[in-house]
Amino acid sequence: MGSYTIPNVVERTPQGERSYDVFSRLLSERIIFLGTEIDDGVANVVIAQLLHLESSAPESEIAVYINSPGGSFTSLMAIYDTMTFVQAPISTFCVGQAASTAAVLLAGGDPGRRFVLEHARVLLGQPASGGRQGTVSDLALQAKEMVRIRSQVEEVLARHTHHDVATLRADMDRDKVFTAQEAVAYGLADEVLARRLTRV
């Protein structure tokens, strides 16, 4: 969150007033908000929230709202694997953007539960190399790992978009930006939303 102030929400109850930070208040409604670059710290928080919500009500929907430029592949896969591991149905919502690794999380929501708001964008691209340095042998090993990572991303996206890996590889060779409607047509999301769904 950087230097932003996290707002508090005041709730009046028969016992008096209670103050929560806004993210805790959203969590009490089974909403997880991912609004930053994905790194190990962010992944650990999101995973803990997913596991907590599953343990409290394993059959109830968890909504994951995404506005992220992407980030670490290993952190992404830790979140993605937890989303597929928990019993609770997972809805994903793209607000603003789901770029790079964050696009995989959007696509990884349960079928029929992947949404994109009407002015959001989704960006597909190759996993970043991170500007690695080292000996020629080290660089060769790093290049091999990058190819493995790219293949893993392609396989996950193929599973959720129903495109073949060759199509995904060609589309991800350079950054490819989708409007909300294009993201649905491509299979990264199921529906464009202008207004909130009635939650059940």
Swiss-Prot record:
Q: Name one GO molecular function term.
A: ATPase binding
Q: What cellular component GO annotations does this protein have?
A: cytoplasm; endopeptidase Clp complex
Q: Where is the active site?
A: S100 (nucleophile)
In which domain of life is the source organism classified?
A: Bacteria
Tell me which Gene Ontology terms the entry assigns under biological process.
Answer: protein quality control for misfolded or incompletely synthesized proteins
Which InterPro entries would you find in this protein's record? Answer: ClpP, ClpP/crotonase-like_dom_sf, ClpP/TepA
Q: Which residues cross the membrane?
A: none
What family does the database annotate? Belongs to the peptidase S14 family.
What does the UniProt record say this protein does?
Answer: Has lost one of the conserved residue (His) proposed to be part of the active site. Therefore it could be inactive.
* Protein name (Swiss-Prot/TrEMBL): Putative ATP-dependent Clp protease proteolytic subunit-like
Which species does the entry assign this protein to? Streptomyces coelicolor (strain ATCC BAA-471 / A3(2) / M145)
Gene (name only) = clpP4
